[in-house]
């Protein structure tokens, strides 16, 4: 990045932000700056931050809808909705310790990265709760889902496209989200000493049972021994949430169904919440210097990642999300994951964060990029060729 890019531009209105983008300078787009290390922005001339767009526009708890500017801090939103007995359903991770950053993640940043926590397997991904958006395209045009139609982007689902685009298609300035009532009670069942394959089968069985498991994770022995878990053997965890009587009945049903797995312990609500924060934030891997990979795979084959690639792993989403610490060659990591039908993103390390897209997907991405940002001014190079 050039010396000029050291200046961080913090517009206070969407119109001012659009004016900056319309100038055509190449921009590194950030919210709280906590994920700047994921992907490498090449040739940016300035840094554009949404941190000054930090107001809650409207919150109607009775309608389960919240509208806020993109620069609102995620932690502040969580406090706001919790005071009304509600929650962000997709349980967004902060990842500041894992990524070794000092900033505060923002609502826009979490949605731009489409980051979801353990509850994704029950409630859906971040993009599934993204009801509306206002954004500025690379042309400097202000667009809204369900609002003004701009001919160059007509026909696109704005929310679905911007979620996971890492700021390469448009700069989110305002979003509307669905919120849900927070669970009245929760508990977590713990099983010990299972292999990765056994845990994968157990999590699949639990998720297919009529008990509404809201989170399922497996921490192998080598990972469980790390702080903060410090467990002597592998831990497989299954969370249940809801009304107290329902949670208790479902826990009894699930424990009976998994009786063959051996000793089962229960974490009460407080300890359960602490445990899932550790899983959500991948705290066991925060201090290890090795390259870190975030791998999405079909849950039924997730355990094969740890079996095939040397390193330490942690499984979330019933095996569908695998965090991997490994010095293995990036080509090996991506090759194994590709054969499993998944995708690997390098969150820490020297490898490119995002793998190049193949054939028709690359062509489609190029067409979408051309529609939203034809001159490539937004986060150039962050997602590779996109």
Question: Can you describe what each PLM-predicted range is?
Answer:
Residues 2-29, 50-103, 111, 115-148, ...:
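N-terminal glycine-rich flavin-associated loop
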Residues 16-17, 76-77, 196-201, 245-252, ...:
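Short, conserved charged micro-motifs
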Residues 24-27, 81, 258, 337, ...:
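A generic structural signal for well-ordered alpha-helical segments
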Residues 29-35:
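Glycine-rich beta-strand-to-loop/alpha-helix junction loops that act as flexible
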Residues 31, 238, 324:
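Residue-level signal for inorganic ion chemistry
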Residues 36-42, 228-229:
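Short glycine-biased active-site loop of nucleotidyltransferases that positions the nucleotide triphosphate
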Residues 41-44, 51, 261-386:
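Conserved glycine-rich FAD pyrophosphate-binding loop
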Residues 112, 131-289:
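C-terminal substrate-binding/cap subdomain adjacent to the FAD-binding core in PCMH-type
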